[in-house]
């Protein structure tokens, strides 16, 4: 178990925070990829400019 001194205000150790950040960033990247593909599909189907 981590010492109280090793924890940040979130209660996570540095290793746990880095792992959570990596998972969050991969989910964000997937969301952005889907959003870009959806925008391209709509732009091909019905251009808005």
From Swiss-Prot:
BP terms from Gene Ontology: photosynthesis, light reaction
Periplasmic-side segments: 46-49
Entry GO CC: plasma membrane; plasma membrane light-harvesting complex
Binding positions (a bacteriochlorophyll): 21, 39
Xref: Pfam families: LHC
GO MF annotations in UniProt: bacteriochlorophyll binding; electron transporter, transferring electrons within the cyclic electron transport pathway of photosynthesis activity; metal ion binding
Cytoplasmic-side positions: 2-22
Predominant cellular place of this UniProt entry's protein: membrane
Transmembrane regions: 23-45
Entry keyword set: Antenna complex, Bacteriochlorophyll, Cell inner membrane, Cell membrane, Chlorophyll, Chromophore, Light-harvesting polypeptide, Magnesium, Membrane, Metal-binding, Transmembrane, Transmembrane helix
Keyword Disulfide bond among record annotations: no
Topology versus the membrane: Single-pass type II membrane protein
SUPFAM superfamilies (alphabetical): Light-harvesting complex subunits
Function, as annotated: Antenna complexes are light-harvesting systems, which transfer the excitation energy to the reaction centers.
Oligomer and partners: The core complex is formed by different alpha and beta chains, binding bacteriochlorophyll molecules, and arranged most probably in tetrameric structures disposed around the reaction center. The non-pigmented gamma chains may constitute additional components.
Matching NCBIfam families: pufB_517_ASD
Homology family: Belongs to the antenna complex beta subunit family.
UniProt name for this protein: Light-harvesting protein B-870 beta chain
Organism: Rhodobacter capsulatus
């Amino acid at each position: 178990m981590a010492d109280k001194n090793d924890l940040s205000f979130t209660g996570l150790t540095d290793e746990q925070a880095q792992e959570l950040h990596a998972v969050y960033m991969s989910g964000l990247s997937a969301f952005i990829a889907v959003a870009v593909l959806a925008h391209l599909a709509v732009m091909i189907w019905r251009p808005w400019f």
